[in-house]
Amino acid sequence: MKEKLLTLLFALIAYGSFGQDISLYQQFNGRYDFTFMGNTLNPSENNITPTCTINTSSSANLNLAPGNNIIAAYLYWAGSGTGDFDILLNGQPVTQQRNFPLSALNTDGQTRAYFSAFADVTAQVQATGNGAYTVSELDLTAWISDPLYCGIKTNFGGWAIIVFYENASLPLNQLNLYDGLEYVPTAINITLPSLNVIDNVGAK
């Protein structure tokens, strides 16, 4: 059995922080694989103009091959500030079911808040299938325009949907989904439990 892992780690450079450790959220065993899609809300590279701006929506496409049956789909979103936890996915309301707050002491000596959030959108993605997915009403404008974030290039927002699927033609796999929100100092150690890679062929 091959081992594949997926780690959702929104990383920020900082001196110290209070966040959420990376941990195992879910494991799938069988003829499974995964893909993901997502997009940023940033209209351009961070801090290239005196005033930072951000979009409140963006889109991405799902393109699964025929025969791949969706078994789970999870939406993650993240950004600067304390968070916006009620958003829309293709016009349908989505409310966070888990969230990962982070208070980071950045390199300029200022403490800033960042966040990530999670929602299970399996039913919606199964019903929609391939096509365009738009996350909207994710409004981080108040934080992005604040010089506290814009001044050190930590103004950001974005989202991703992780899609797990089954196909009888796939080899037996073990898929581990790890998530959390941590800062990245000059060095960091992250321990991933329940990970036993016996063959790196096809691992990812």
Which residues fall in each region the model found?
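Bacterial Sec-dependent N-terminal signal peptides
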Residues: 1-21
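Disulfide-rich extracellular domains of secreted proteins
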Residues: 19-204
